[in-house]
Amino acid sequence: MTTEGLVVPALSTQQDDSTFEFDKVCSKTVVRSHLGLPNDATDDQVIKRIREYYNISEICNFLKQKVEGHELDMIPKYKHVTLQFPDSLICDSASIVHELQRELGLMPRTEDSSEVKCSADSCCKTGKVESPLSQKLWILADTSYSSCCIDEVAAGHVNSDLVIHFGDACLNVVESLPAAYVFGKPSLKLDSVITQFKEIYANRDSKILIMADAPHTQSLNQLYNILKPEYPNLAYADLYLNPSSNASIIGYDPCPSQSSILNVLNRTIIGLDNGDIDTDIDTILLEHDLFHIEVPAVPRLLQLTTRFQSVTTFEPKSGLASQGPYPKLMRRYRYMHMARSAGTVGLLVNTLSLANTKTLINKIGQKIKEAGKKHYVFVVGKPNVAKLANFENIDIWCVLGCDHQGIIIDENNEYYKPIVTPYELLLALNKDQNWSGKWVTDFNKVLEDMSLEDERNKQEINDGSDNNEEDSDDEAPEFNPVTGQYVSTSKPLRKLHHLQISSQEQHPELDNEGSQDLVKKFSSAVAIKDTVSTSAMHLQTRHWTGLGSDFQQNDSDEEANNEDGALVEDGRAGIARGYDYDRETKFQ
């Protein structure tokens, strides 16, 4: 037998040099389309454009402010500064911070480590010492909630005393932290805008209002002056910053407001006739067609469609205009009716920075209790389908967030339960009030409506028109207006006289029973202390109700009902390389 045909068996899989090489990370080309630079732009050109786009010099002048009335004139007013960027502008964050540090002289100086004492601010391990008069900069990349709002939560982690917000912003009033807005200077081709504008609005006498997002609003004044001679009824919306807010805008000065009634949607209307100023602002807006530069977020777009006669959006990148389709208001009307038959409401907090958030939560909670419903407050960060799906016993969600991007509009029916706004929930709780077609998302407007309703109720009580005597009969049955089915848990906090559970004080013979029997009585009851227990009713509909429930047999098997559930035993403890029984075996 020859050995020529024999093959040595492989003791391992085939390996070559590529097996032991590190995986190569493909470098990504950063696309900065908002800067308007060619793809082959040099680093110097990019830095120069960034300084012009974000007004780096004006930001430095703003940060160079000193504390007034202090003994030392060199103490900076803002020592801990956080820079907040949206995802689309995070690519410029490192360059912006480097330019700010270079111009403000914030580069740390290095000293001999032997002369440095260990402390909280400086450590001998690094040998770097921060001057007590210097400033510190942090980058906030991942916002806690909506990117258009000031992120006070993330800024509080570094004890920030100023937040500089870059990009588009909602300009809503912040709770406490000072803020500054830097919108940037995006390029806008006015010729393309004018061409599309004239094609859509052939009638020169039409009442038209021009609006844009915060960065493109800086170009509206120039566009307005060009189109005004041909369109006499033309107006535009400039930015409006509430004087009560501790915020400022860097690089742009909005036009002053002509009248307080023209301040709406965080904008001030410019160019209206003097006769229209005395008219109700809602009536004025309904008479105008809106031409909006840049496509707003879905909540903002839905809000605009309810305030104007028609809405046209213009996309600056593509240069095309669109008149729909837009989010439908009928779905909001349907969700409002579903909220009327809901028994458990989940208040979903989607912001922690806006003013009056806590006040709105407390007042809405009180309204829910008065309506005989239950509510729970949830703070889960950025909401998504998976997070909200964990709470099955919630019948409907009420989201409290920014009116620009903080309101959840479920266009694709991804969420398992309907999501409404505070305004829609208040309409559902007050059955005597009909929906006029408006869609209100402003916190202050909702609080004003609640205050007016409370005043009317007090006036009715004083006039004696309110009857405080309770009817002896049960309340009228509640039906779901969408499905038509009877709903028995729409008001779980209402007083019941036909369903209740006995306590040990009322029946002392329960003391002789076992603790397990008492638990079973409470778990099977649907009413506790004269109110419906939605948790107990939801638990009864589940197949798995806890440990040992999978050992229970059918109700017809009397012997099986008396059997105990699974016994709880000590499990395996330790880590994978050495559990308890492994150690005992090793030492034996």
Swiss-Prot record:
<dbReference type="GO" id="GO:0017183">
    <property type="term" value="P:protein histidyl modification to diphthamide"/>
</dbReference>
<feature type="binding site">
    <location>
        <position position="402"/>
    </location>
    <ligand>
        <name>[4Fe-4S] cluster</name>
    </ligand>
</feature>
<feature type="region of interest" description="Disordered">
    <location>
        <begin position="454"/>
        <end position="485"/>
    </location>
</feature>
<comment type="function">
    <text>Required for the first step of diphthamide biosynthesis, a post-translational modification of histidine which occurs in elongation factor 2. DPH1 and DPH2 transfer a 3-amino-3-carboxypropyl (ACP) group from S-adenosyl-L-methionine (SAM) to a histidine residue, the reaction is assisted by a reduction system comprising DPH3 and a NADH-dependent reductase, predominantly CBR1. Facilitates the reduction of the catalytic iron-sulfur cluster found in the DPH1 subunit.</text>
</comment>
<dbReference type="InterPro" id="IPR010014">
    <property type="entry name" value="DHP2"/>
</dbReference>
<keyword id="KW-0963">Cytoplasm</keyword>
<feature type="compositionally biased region" description="Acidic residues">
    <location>
        <begin position="466"/>
        <end position="477"/>
    </location>
</feature>
<protein>
    <recommendedName>
        <fullName>2-(3-amino-3-carboxypropyl)histidine synthase subunit 2</fullName>
    </recommendedName>
</protein>
<comment type="similarity">
    <text>Belongs to the DPH1/DPH2 family. DPH2 subfamily.</text>
</comment>
<dbReference type="InterPro" id="IPR042265">
    <property type="entry name" value="DPH1/DPH2_3"/>
</dbReference>
<dbReference type="GO" id="GO:0051539">
    <property type="term" value="F:4 iron, 4 sulfur cluster binding"/>
</dbReference>
<keyword id="KW-0408">Iron</keyword>
<feature type="binding site">
    <location>
        <position position="170"/>
    </location>
    <ligand>
        <name>[4Fe-4S] cluster</name>
    </ligand>
</feature>
<comment type="pathway">
    <text>Protein modification; peptidyl-diphthamide biosynthesis.</text>
</comment>
<dbReference type="GO" id="GO:0120513">
    <property type="term" value="C:2-(3-amino-3-carboxypropyl)histidine synthase complex"/>
</dbReference>
<keyword id="KW-0411">Iron-sulfur</keyword>
<dbReference type="Pfam" id="PF01866">
    <property type="entry name" value="Diphthamide_syn"/>
</dbReference>
<dbReference type="GO" id="GO:0090560">
    <property type="term" value="F:2-(3-amino-3-carboxypropyl)histidine synthase activity"/>
</dbReference>
<dbReference type="InterPro" id="IPR016435">
    <property type="entry name" value="DPH1/DPH2"/>
</dbReference>
<feature type="region of interest" description="Disordered">
    <location>
        <begin position="546"/>
        <end position="588"/>
    </location>
</feature>
<dbReference type="GO" id="GO:0005737">
    <property type="term" value="C:cytoplasm"/>
</dbReference>
<dbReference type="InterPro" id="IPR042263">
    <property type="entry name" value="DPH1/DPH2_1"/>
</dbReference>
<feature type="compositionally biased region" description="Basic and acidic residues">
    <location>
        <begin position="579"/>
        <end position="588"/>
    </location>
</feature>
<comment type="subunit">
    <text>Component of the 2-(3-amino-3-carboxypropyl)histidine synthase complex composed of DPH1, DPH2, DPH3 and a NADH-dependent reductase, predominantly CBR1.</text>
</comment>
<keyword id="KW-0479">Metal-binding</keyword>
<dbReference type="GO" id="GO:0046872">
    <property type="term" value="F:metal ion binding"/>
</dbReference>
<feature type="binding site">
    <location>
        <position position="149"/>
    </location>
    <ligand>
        <name>[4Fe-4S] cluster</name>
    </ligand>
</feature>
